């Protein structure tokens, strides 16, 4: 596993089958520890030329995609390559290393709308 600060904190765990784990249950157990209370937790699987990624964001639960988790995961998997694809439930992102920065390219879609209720 890796612990990375990408503007927010991420615990990134490599697994053989990213979709075979109960991510909500795992995240709940990890966050019981004081140090990991507000950490985003991601699982990833390495595939040829791409990574599969699932993320449980602190305070939100599992999300379709997470840009900071994608960047955090790519940051230590892109070392010998100039770019990598990340596949999540929300779609595909391409991340490219340019000098010491990461460029993220992918679609954005409107998926829902809500109303803020005041007490």
Q: Across the structure, where does each feature detected by a protein language model lie?
A:
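Active-site proximal loop and beta-alpha junction motif in alpha/beta enzyme cores
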Residues: 1-64, 72-119
């Amino acid at each position: 596993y890796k612990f990375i600060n990408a503007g927010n904190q991420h615990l990134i765990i490599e697994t053989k089958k990213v979709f075979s784990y109960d991510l909500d249950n795992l995240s709940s157990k990890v966050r019981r520890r004081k140090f990991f209370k507000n950490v985003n937790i991601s699982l990833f699987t390495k595939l040829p030329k791409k990574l599969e990624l699932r993320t449980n964001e602190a305070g939100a639960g599992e999300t379709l995609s997470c840009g900071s988790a994608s960047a955090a995961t790519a940051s230590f998997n892109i070392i010998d390559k100039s770019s990598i694809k990340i596949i999540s439930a929300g779609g595909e992102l391409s991340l490219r290393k340019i000098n010491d920065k990461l460029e993220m390219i992918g679609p954005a879609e409107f998926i829902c709308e809500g109303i803020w209720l005041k007490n």
